[in-house]
């Protein structure tokens, strides 16, 4: 997870710019600001940003200091899962579970990227571990610790943290020590702690006057609670209402077709699906063999814990109709790895005594190999021989397991060794290849994907583009069984990254602002482009003492400029450029006070729609937050009004040195604004 960690550069520049701001300004860190100007906040909880900011303060902000905490989170998740499984199922299952999680492609991906998901997964695993400790000790403090971990996860990625909550509650109520009334009371007490930790920071933000804090990024009413339960809540599941549908991720069409087989879809399967059949068998078998165990049996309890967690995540991820990214599946990677390990170890032990268990093991290995064969086929040209090796190994393992029940003891030993080696290849051959491939190329933007270039969808690596779909129906196998669809080689429409983004400095990444790109979004993905060095040099040399280097529309434009220059940049409108902050009055005040000389228009996605609100004037206040207005939808757009004011009052500049004209990166224009203009 740590090897070649900086290959992705600043990765998602939306979070990178916020982390850079947090590393330089305690105020920006506390308010979870999206940049050094502090007009708009991130659209997620503050914890991941704080982690990156603290690391930057200690090590100096860089790609390494930003991504190192993510890698540490990934390693700790593996370690904690190992201890959780060891306490309940023994050392062998623990080692297998840790290995499977470490080789799960989506886990490797998020552990090397600056999205909040690595920290989220760590806190969810830690909460599950604390519940196991509560079952062991019977002490309330472990239950409270579990609630604290979930609350911290809520401060990382809001309601997604609660995917683990049903599993924690059900497990303690079913298998916890003591009478039911006592268990209910303790669960209620933990719930109170959970609520307090979850909403402590968000509640504090809402007590601060809107004029003295950043505007809540991607909200429609400048409310953290509206963002939590709207755009990042109901609309993520229903696909309707609650926000603009963008935020730190882009669009709703990135995650395949909703339905029970969504996680096997061509666009998602390579991230998480490898072990799903084995995990399902492991859950069913584990509960069956422990059907007569005492209520407090830890072995059954951990199956309930991991099973409810995985099933809850499967249901939400499979049927959510709002914005979806394949890396969201990292939230269920730990329970899937744990259940798959439990199934493997349990079936191997049971197969020695019962023929029907041997048959179940053989079938599970065959199914796992067949799925890996299909998933590997989604990456044309990627070690094409491996899929046949995996399929052959699965068949060999299945035959060896079945033959072991009818041959003599001497031959059985040799078959057992052959079955073990073949089973290992069948189970981990595919995901480990995808995991290793993830280490080998950089990615950028808001929708990274694990695996080799050309698998699934999106773009990654220099000058390359991922495929939107790979052949699902034409080659048979799991394509037909698990609903895998789409013509081979079909690419997404030109509307930004189809997935993984581009490596910094690649042809695809040189699209905003400047470089040699042909315009924003062809492969770089939102939050993944590099700043034009010529533009940055011009702004630096013509800053003339201004507090802010430039104001730019949307974080995908402003973020790279701030990262390249290290100077405060105003992100007009937040992530998509649609947030009503700063207001026109605030922008005018900044120009009048000499705190801002240049504005870069274009590149955001507010269009002509935008969102009204956020009136008032803060002049050059560092945390204008829209001037206290509550935002909301309106007939007039603040983003359009900002653009109209700039084009009316400021002078277009060609920073390449030609005569004044509406010049700049493709689709963008740089304007010079002076105090006399205001």
Identify the function of each model-found stretch.
Residues 3-14, 115, 119, 202-215, ...:
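C-terminal region of N-terminal signal peptides and the immediate post-cleavage residues
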């Amino acid at each position: 997870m740590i090897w070649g960690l900086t290959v992705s550069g600043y990765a998602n520049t939306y979070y990178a710019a916020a982390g850079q701001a947090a590393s330089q300004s305690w105020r920006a860190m506390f308010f979870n600001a999206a940049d050094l100007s502090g007009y708009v906040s991130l659209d997620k909880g503050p914890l991941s940003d704080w982690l990156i900011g603290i690391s930057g303060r200690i090590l100096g902000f860089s790609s390494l200091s930003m991504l190192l905490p993510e890698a540490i989170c990934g390693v700790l998740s593996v370690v904690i899962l190992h201890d959780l499984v060891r306490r309940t199922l023994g050392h062998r299952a623990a080692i297998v579970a840790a290995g499977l999680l470490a080789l799960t492609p989506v886990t490797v991906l998020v552990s090397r990227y600056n999205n909040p998901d690595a920290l989220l997964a760590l806190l969810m695993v830690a909460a599950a571990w604390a519940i196991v400790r509560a079952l062991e000790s019977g002490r309330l403090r472990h239950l409270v610790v579990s609630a604290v971990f979930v609350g911290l996860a809520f401060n990382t990625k809001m309601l997604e943290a609660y995917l683990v909550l049903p599993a924690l509650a059900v497990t303690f109520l079913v298998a916890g020590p003591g009478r039911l009334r006592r268990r209910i009371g303790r669960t209620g007490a933990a719930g109170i702690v959970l609520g307090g930790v979850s909403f402590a920071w968000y509640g504090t933000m809402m007590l601060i006057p809107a004029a003295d804090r950043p505007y809540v990024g991607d909200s429609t009413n400048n409310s953290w609670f509206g963002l939590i339960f709207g755009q990042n809540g109901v609309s993520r599941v229903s696909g309707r209402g609650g926000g603009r549908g963008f935020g730190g991720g882009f669009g709703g069409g990135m995650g395949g077709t909703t339905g029970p087989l969504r996680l096997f879809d061509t666009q998602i399967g390579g991230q998480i699906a490898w072990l799903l059949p084995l995990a399902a068998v492991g859950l069913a078998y584990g509960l069956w063999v422990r059907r007569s165990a005492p209520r407090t049996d830890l072995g059954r309890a951990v199956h309930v814990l991991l099973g409810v967690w995985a099933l809850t995540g499967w249901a939400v991820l499979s049927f959510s109709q709002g914005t979806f990214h394949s890396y969201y599946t990292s939230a269920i990677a730990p329970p899937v790895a744990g259940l798959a390990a439990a199934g493997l170890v349990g079936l191997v032990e049971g197969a020695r005594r019962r023929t029907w268990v041997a048959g179940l093991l053989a079938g599970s290995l065959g199914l796992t190999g067949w799925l890996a064969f299909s998933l590997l086929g989604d990456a044309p040209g990627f070690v094409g021989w491996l899929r046949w090796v995996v399929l052959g190994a699965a068949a060999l393992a299945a035959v060896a397991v079945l033959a072991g029940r009818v041959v003599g003891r001497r031959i059985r030993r040799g078959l057992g060794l052959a079955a073990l080696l073949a089973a290992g290849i069948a189970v981990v051959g595919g995901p480990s290849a995808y995991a290793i491939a993830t280490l080998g190329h950089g990615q950028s933007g808001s929708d990274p994907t694990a695996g080799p270039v050309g698998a699934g969808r999106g773009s990654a690596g220099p000058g390359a583009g991922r495929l939107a779909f790979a052949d699902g129906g034409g080659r048979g196998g799991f394509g037909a069984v698990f609903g895998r669809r789409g013509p081979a080689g079909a690419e997404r429409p030109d509307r930004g990254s189809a997935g993984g983004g581009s490596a910094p400095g690649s042809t695809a990444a040189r699209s905003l602002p400047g470089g040699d790109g042909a315009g924003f979004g062809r492969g770089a993905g939102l939050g993944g482009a590099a700043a034009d060095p010529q533009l940055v040099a011009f702004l630096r040399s013509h800053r003339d003492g201004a507090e802010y280097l430039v104001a730019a529309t949307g974080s995908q434009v402003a973020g790279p400029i701030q990262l390249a220059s290290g100077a405060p940049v105003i992100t007009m409108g937040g992530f998509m450029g649609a947030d009503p902050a700063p207001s026109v009055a605030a922008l005018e005040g900044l120009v009048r006070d000499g705190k801002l000389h240049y504005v870069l228009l274009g590149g955001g996605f507010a269009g002509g729609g935008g969102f009204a609100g956020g009136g008032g004037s803060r002049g050059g206040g560092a945390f204008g937050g829209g001037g206290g207005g509550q935002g909301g939808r309106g007939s007039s757009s603040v983003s359009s009004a900002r653009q109209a004011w700039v084009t009316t009052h400021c002078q277009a500049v060609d920073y390449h040195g030609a005569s004044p004209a509406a010049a700049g990166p493709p689709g963008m224009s740089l304007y010079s604004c002076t105090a006399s203009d205001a």
